[in-house]
Each structure stands twice: as structure tokens, then as C-alpha cells.
Amino acid sequence: MRRGAIGIYRIFAGSDGASHIEELRLEEHPELGALTNIHEVRVQQFDGTRKRDFNPLPERRLIIHLSGEVEIGTSDDSRHVFRAGDIRLMEDVTGRGHTHVDRSPSSAVYVILKD
């Protein structure tokens, strides 16, 4: 995956229930630049100790990383580190889900999306 000025990544469950990560280009997904289906927005800080095994999320969310590093793992055992400036569109609300490991204290904006 390339590292540009803004990295936008989608984490989703495939038809087989396995989780996957794909990079999105904002110019190909303009809807990400003007979200109107927002349920809640919150800013959160974490102390760097979260470590979760595979789990799906309870709702779709967009996560905008402000500081720190977070590692997300998918069903095929690939891992991706997200840093300040990266954006994750989390859509793996079914299936096996993903793993999560804080690599440092971090902060992020959580945008909870309506379906």
C-alpha cells in the first residue's frame, strides 16, 4: 500500500466472512469527503495498552488518526500500521473481524455512521 499525503483505507468483510484492507483514493470516492450519514462524532485518547483478538465492530465508522500508531490485522494474517493523518473506513461489522494492537498512546476522531 502506498503512503501518500492522506491514506484512506477500508477494512471490510468479504463474502467469505474474512476481513480485508484496501486503499481508497479520495478522487474515486468523493462521498468520503462529504459524509451526511453521521450518527455521532467523538474524539478519543488511548494510553497505548489496547490489544484485541479478532472481533467485528458493532457499527460502521470512520476513524481519523490524530497521533500515535495502531496496528490492524486481517484474516489472512496481513497487518497494517495506521499513523497520524491516516483514515480508516471500518466496515467489518460481520464475519471474523480484525485484530487491534496499540503500538503507542494514540488519539483519533471517531465518526459513527448511520446505515
Model-identified regions with their sequence ranges:
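A short beta-strand-loop-beta hairpin characteristic of the jelly-roll/cupin
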Residues: N55-P56, L62-A84
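Conserved short histidine dyad/triad with adjacent acidic residue
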Residues: L26-H29, N37-L57, H80, E91-G95, ...
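Short, ordered coil/turn segments that flank beta-strands lining enzyme active or ligand-binding pockets
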Residues: G14-S15, L66, S75, S104
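Ligand-binding loop in jelly-roll beta-barrel domains
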Residues: H39, S75-D86, D92-D115
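Short solvent-exposed loop/turn micro-motifs enriched in small/polar/acidic residues
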Residues: R3-A5, N55-P56, G73, V93
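A short, N-terminal "cap"/entry segment at the start of jelly-roll beta-barrel domains
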Residues: M1-F46
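Preference for bulky hydrophobic residues occupying beta-strand positions
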Residues: Q44, I64, I72, Y110-V111
